[in-house]
Amino acid sequence: TEYISKNTVIPFLFDAARAKCKVAFENPGGPTIWDHLRDDPDRYIYTAVKHGAVQALPPEIAAGVEDVSARTQWNQKAPADFGLPTEIWREVVARRTRYAEVRAKLAAGEVREINDLITLNLDIRQFAQDVIERCEGPDLLRAFWNAIEGVTVLDPTCGSGAFLFAALNILEPLYETCLDRMEAFVADLERPADGHAPKKF
């Protein structure tokens, strides 16, 4: 439920915000929201995907990366330092390879569409939170605020309401982050640069 909600609600918000503040998404030669992904790739890759990736593979396992005939131990269970619960070495190597590929894409600035975060199984909630929290101008913040205020969620199953609650749990932190960022903008606006109270027009 949470997976479906975040991967439908958040892309809607980004598409709505993009329509009202295109420059934050498409700005050749200038900063965009996608820079967050490039500047800190690991922040948006789930911990489970990165598990054990910083450690060098044992020699007997690493030998099989290039030499298929050296994979005799790849079907054995990997220790906890390297593998997730129930993972065998073959799965560990595949996960590490995937992690390296995804991280390289992010670091190269190749991910520039919100749906790519779904395709690559990235932390789309953290990205949305960071984009709003780090807004440098009011236009993008206003665009997200309007999108959040105007979103309508329909529960297709009309069951217990779990889908609606999941959507609420996704929207509420973003709503609060918008308010916090608005307060910061207002505080900056009201803070006099020369020590005197600003004139009101």
Where does each model-flagged region fall?
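Class I S-adenosyl-L-methionine
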Residues: 1-157, 163-200
